[in-house]
Amino acid sequence: PSELDRALKYETGYAGRSWFLKDMQDNQLGNQIASSIVTAYSDPTMEGYGSFSYDHEGTPARRAYILRDGVLEEFLNNRQTAAIMGVEPNGSARSTEAQLVPLIRMTNTIFAPGQQDPQSIIADVEDGYYIAGHRTPSIAESRENFRITAVKVYEIKKGQLGRLYRDGGITSDSRDYFMSIDAVGN
């Protein structure tokens, strides 16, 4: 939901909207929308697939912090939507073909590493599940709810991986999910 064309409802029929911005006065910019240990960014300057130096409007590529310490910091934007919000464009306009209008899209989207070793996170779980190998994501039009199916789901009991299940998943309210994160692996 961090693409500003979606948030401004430019492509609701095509790709949905965003709960980050209901309208210009009712938006989540600057608000805590995730746990303070969550930082996420889109970075087209990283080497590899999804990398570029300039977007398809000629804007220099740069890292765009979507969430920093759980606070919604910026939307991915293009020149038009950046002007509407009164901010600088962040190089997120891309097109699959030269004759098509560039759309605002994520590049290399990263959740920044946390402080904890993944094994210590599992060891701290009394009763839960470890979900591995996502398969099919599904998200509501407003991006408020989501479902992700997984290849493997391990039961966790008293800090130990246990029974293996196939084809499980998770369904959640996006806001509740992001606010309830209490550990991020390194």
Where are these regions (language model features)?
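N-terminal small-residue-enriched
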Residues: P1-N186
